[in-house]
């Protein structure tokens, strides 16, 4: 109701009074809240004038006409009752509206005066009078009274009323508009200040003096709500109040900041628009002022460009500087720096002239002695020749006289010239110089720059026979005290100080010189046209130029006033110091301080700054005249040159000389781009570009690596191409200083061919702009082409090639020609060009059958280099072809993506564009032979075998195992092609790694081959193999990559009416003998399976093994088949081609016979796991044996062993001494001591940062009350075992900050001083990985926190003492500890108990049983690692509530709140995590490894090819005796500790694929032979090469809301020393790898089955613990699975027969495993060995197998 009435009775008017106050305040630099009395009067005047112009309403009986002259009845406020504040007494609404006042505007509606609401208010006594409100109380801001047009006066106008009596406090007006809020805040703050509450209000320069009380907060809230109605508040104020309606202080602080910011910006713009400079202040001060304003505006988001800034500056120039814009009018691209350079030059010249003026001054006594003694101050003859202006010369001379009489301090240029001209000069009657000036009566001693002189120019005088100049700066070969007498036209003598040469450097690089005389006693610098004529230079006043007799223009002439001038910029400055041309008195100079001395004393500041400081007395004791400035100009301080060295500036257009000096193709720029990651091996990772300087013609070549021979091949190719195609020889090649260009091989090649290499300077990439810009342009085009076409990323270089062809054909805006035209080539025929990625149909000239479709869908890439064809990508064949046999696909909807490309590609336009080219082909078409191969050789694209073991189906469709009919034939009509078949995949399949992307020269394609064999060119032959497949399901022509890689399973839905045997062609793996298997019905299949008996013989090795998972069904373990399938679903298992199933009998469930005499598998024996696993071929595939690891170590053996087998016995010299040496090896120290970081640190900057960190740590220790500061103890009084040594350690963190930590020496702490039973717990890595995985699947927010000085929050129970820090200087004293100092044995446990108690009691958390440092409640999960916390929750507000509670007790910093929906990067416990909520998570350590590995001093990048696997099968560690010296042994063991320590850290964090190699080498840390070290180097090299790899997780999309926990187990029997087995396990949660383990079995197993049982039994306990943790954190059902590739192990687990257990140990192990499986509801399933990713944990694998097993989950 009140707000409605207010809106009815309070119309909003924007009065002029408030506007005037605002405009006045923004022009000042004072506090925006400071309203002075001077402003009050001015604002009152403006307000009165504004109000007098407003219309008034008729007067009312209730309210006077003008409330400024008559006050309404004051409010009667009763005495306080029942509390500190009075009771409210308000008029009702009807009473208020009778008088016409708004509801909140009437004084009697005020509950009590504001000063009475203040907590400082004291109730009045019986005789006290209540204060009366002023007559304008309660009126609206900028709103007139209902009866009057007068607006409410501003706060400044009422200041006198406020201060007139201490008992009167003027209330603020009522806010009526959001736009007036900031002005209202000013008045409101003044109201609070007058209410004695100013000390609780923050200002722009300081914080509040004290905290407010509850009563004061109530007062603020009440008055704010009373005078600022909510409907008139700005939105940002409402946002603050919506969070906390009592947070008035935040509103006031933000308002003050807004006012301060707005005021500063307006002041800066106003200052810039009103600049004024006339040379009265130093030029550097003016430059600093303007530069600061421009920088401040730019930082505030108001950039001022060069043109506008120069206009502001030039508009503010006056005096002699007003001619500067005229002198700069020819400069088009003028910058602020150039303009200030001219101002500085003019200022220095002006100061020099003033100093010279004071050097020649007559004394009155001299004038009395000789009335004819005077100096020449008249004008040149050219002035007097104008008869119309006879009096100008006299007036100008008078003005010059006024300037010259001003005394100025000497300057650095000509202060010593005074020595020869201080005495009066007597005129002589010689006529050596005739200047043609008329006689005047002036008695001026010296003339400064005249008002009509053009600064920085020479006056051209045709009547002068000699050239005169006032400054000695341009005189060359000067000689002092010349015997020359010079007079002017009035026969007056002109004193000459020196004679020399004036050297010119004109526009055409012409240099010439004339004689010049130096004198400071002339009005202008005169340039004699007679002397110019002597050197063949004349002045043409019609063209206003200086020119030679042949018409060559040398310099422009400027006409200013009545005279002609030429600029001094063509004068060459002299290298001779000024004193050499002056008569310097030795006694005078020796009394002055030399400038180099002052320069060094004043911190190597520049001369200009020093002089300015002396002139303004900021440096005292001596004056500016006490310094010898003669050497200031030419002085070069060597220390300044070294310490202040900067890069050179690149001048725009500096490369023009190269374009003018070289012919086309003689000067090339080159650069290399790359590498591009996550591409197949066959795709190029780099490209090298070349650009011709003159024509801008470009070439690009693909590169797979940056080796010397690869670069040399490209250089050889392009040089031969240029020589043969353009008949040109390359003379210079510009390149950067990369190792690929600076190597000796390339250097010799260039030297042999007479080519000059031009390298850029170190760290100067801008000098290589041509090549760098080209690479950037090509990459932009590449990304655009791939995005537009939807082609996979491995075709990126095709996009580069296409862009290069087009860019060479486009005209340059600068040269108006294309690069091809500059090179003399014809323009690009656009009719031969297709859009990149254009769908086409390519003719298949040699199909596999006559009824097979002849058209293959493809995508056009770019014209061929080697033929008249086009390069086309065929997704179905995984390769590119060079062909002319293609037809453009017309269907626009058959584009690569789902986007509408109608606006991008128009088929009608494309047909019209290519019509002529197609007709040309049709008219010249010849009969093609049947054996014509569409695959031609071309040098940068080729086949892409995404699935090397699958055949290339020209239909881009694989036959599904469930299809019942052969594929239907396709017609040749392109319009009938299935649109889904021409859609290219967006990403390359992860299995594409061993293929070749360059097309092969020749491939045989003979049909009906009974086997798939690898050809020399890397292709695969196609064959037809019948497959047992159901016939009931219909075949579809749509296929995808997913359908090709699906696991084959037996279908339970075979049709009963289909009993015919049908041979279905199917591809098979390479090297497999395939047979034609008749297709049968389901019943026949079951009969065959039942009646077949198990056998283990050689015949079984010829059949194919199961590539899919074979679940083992039992009533206890796997009651339903869908449960088994769900366990396998979504696991990152490798994709294998489908194979025929293996028939199994019921007897499979029986326990197989165990051969106790089975041979060691490492020596060639066959284990139990091979009993039912068929061997693909007796010969091992060549691809299985291929490896890229080139053994460069001469100690590596090549014996045929399966593993890196350690020796059976490690022999050393002095075994006991060696063990002692290991114990004495100190751990790696990554920190610095106090003396290293501060005392003896020579790096000053680093030392200062460490000192700052030191003081910060000390302050933190004192703040936390770490020790008792009240009492210091004597060392002799304290038990020594209770004294803990302490020290400061310093280190530099990964983020670049310097850290100091005061720690205790816990390593020497006495056992009696701590409880050994206490534990310092941290979160387990598996718990962290589990929490991260659940966060991804549940769309959780992840918040990372850090608690500063966490240990210091925990109290210490024991009585311990430490020595004080070094800065206290009390070495003999001790202080008692009160807090848990870092380094103490009990500090970690104390902190854990402290934070655990706080989280449980104050935050409502509970710790998960069995998992320390994992806390949870119904909404939030917390993982604690010492002082780091990671919070997980569905709702971010839940995390914020926990943070607020933590901040109440601890200094908590939010490292990453995790509120963004985009990708967020974390650094959690060493893991670099990239997380996009609801999509993916990537875990890696690239930055950390990039920083740490180079510090290990490992020889990275050894000779040989890049490693593709961490180890090589067939290598083992030699058993040779280790003979080492003791010191050498210590050093090598220390090195092994560092290397294996880092590798273990990385492996157990996320690189689980390396754990086998890490575990094997870790067993040899005490056996550091050369072979072991070399193998360790190879492992570190592989980690370095793959440091960018990441553990990839994607959000799971389960069919049912359940969690799936799976462990995959494997064992390698007897492959470790003493026939121990290696076991490995990988744990997966919802398809994401969360952990792995590889270790040597603790017991010796006697068979592979026993080893597998041991591996499984080791994995079950952790599997159960993880299951409990998952159920605690996520209340969903959980499915637990156990996968193994040992069928015999599965049969033992599910069998009830114990008779065949051969020993007690084996039986008890198996029985326990049975109980665990049944009791924990584990689903045990079989997984084929080829798909068992845990295989990488137990043995070294070939490269192909290693990649196949790991590329799905780490890449």
Curated annotation (Swiss-Prot):
GO BP annotation list: DNA integration; DNA recombination; proteolysis; transposition; viral translational frameshifting
Keywords carried by this UniProt record: Aspartyl protease, ATP-binding, Cytoplasm, DNA integration, DNA recombination, DNA-binding, DNA-directed DNA polymerase, Endonuclease, Hydrolase, Magnesium, Metal-binding, Multifunctional enzyme, Nuclease, Nucleotide-binding, Nucleotidyltransferase, Nucleus, Protease, RNA-binding, RNA-directed DNA polymerase, Transferase, Transposable element, Transposition, Viral release from host cell, Virion maturation, Zinc, Zinc-finger
Reactions catalysed according to its record: DNA(n) + a 2'-deoxyribonucleoside 5'-triphosphate = DNA(n+1) + diphosphate; Endonucleolytic cleavage to 5'-phosphomonoester
Stretches for region Disordered: 20-84, 137-173, 350-420, 956-1172
Entries under Gene3D superfamilies matching the protein: Ribonuclease H-like superfamily/Ribonuclease H (3.30.420.10)
Segments of skewed composition (Basic and acidic residues): 363-372, 1044-1053
GO cellular component, one term: cytoplasm
Active site (catalytic residues): 461 (for protease activity)
Residue ranges of the region described as Integrase-type zinc finger-like: 583-640
Residues where Mg(2+) 3 binds: 1610, 1652, 1685
Biased composition (Polar residues): 20-31, 46-55, 137-168, 373-411, 1005-1017, 1031-1043, 1054-1082, 1095-1106
Family matches, as PROSITE patterns: ASP_PROTEASE, INTEGRASE
Domain RNase H Ty1/copia-type: 1610-1752
Main location: cytoplasm
Chain residue ranges for the region called RNA-binding: 299-401
Membrane-spanning segments: none
Ranges of biased composition (kind: Low complexity): 960-969
GO molecular function: aspartic-type endopeptidase activity; ATP binding; DNA binding; DNA-directed DNA polymerase activity; RNA binding; RNA-directed DNA polymerase activity; RNA-DNA hybrid ribonuclease activity; zinc ion binding
Enzyme Commission code: 3.4.23.-, 2.7.7.49, 2.7.7.7, 3.1.26.4
Binding site for Mg(2+) 1: 671, 736
Keyword Methyltransferase carried by entry: no
Further comment: Retrotransposons are mobile genetic entities that are able to replicate via an RNA intermediate and a reverse transcription step. In contrast to retroviruses, retrotransposons are non-infectious, lack an envelope and remain intracellular. Ty1 retrotransposons belong to the copia elements (pseudoviridae).
Quaternary state and interactors: The capsid protein forms a homotrimer, from which the VLPs are assembled. The protease is a homodimer, whose active site consists of two apposed aspartic acid residues.
Comment field on protein domains: The C-terminal RNA-binding region of CA is sufficient for all its nucleocapsid-like chaperone activities. Integrase core domain contains the D-x(n)-D-x(35)-E motif, named for the phylogenetically conserved glutamic acid and aspartic acid residues and the invariant 35 amino acid spacing between the second and third acidic residues. Each acidic residue of the D,D(35)E motif is independently essential for the 3'-processing and strand transfer activities of purified integrase protein.
Role description: Capsid protein (CA) is the structural component of the virus-like particle (VLP), forming the shell that encapsulates the retrotransposons dimeric RNA genome. The particles are assembled from trimer-clustered units and there are holes in the capsid shells that allow for the diffusion of macromolecules. CA also has nucleocapsid-like chaperone activity, promoting primer tRNA(i)-Met annealing to the multipartite primer-binding site (PBS), dimerization of Ty1 RNA and initiation of reverse transcription.
Protein name per its UniProtKB record: Transposon Ty1-BL Gag-Pol polyprotein
Source organism phylogeny: Eukaryota, Fungi, Dikarya, Ascomycota, Saccharomycotina
Gene from which this protein is expressed: TY1B-BL
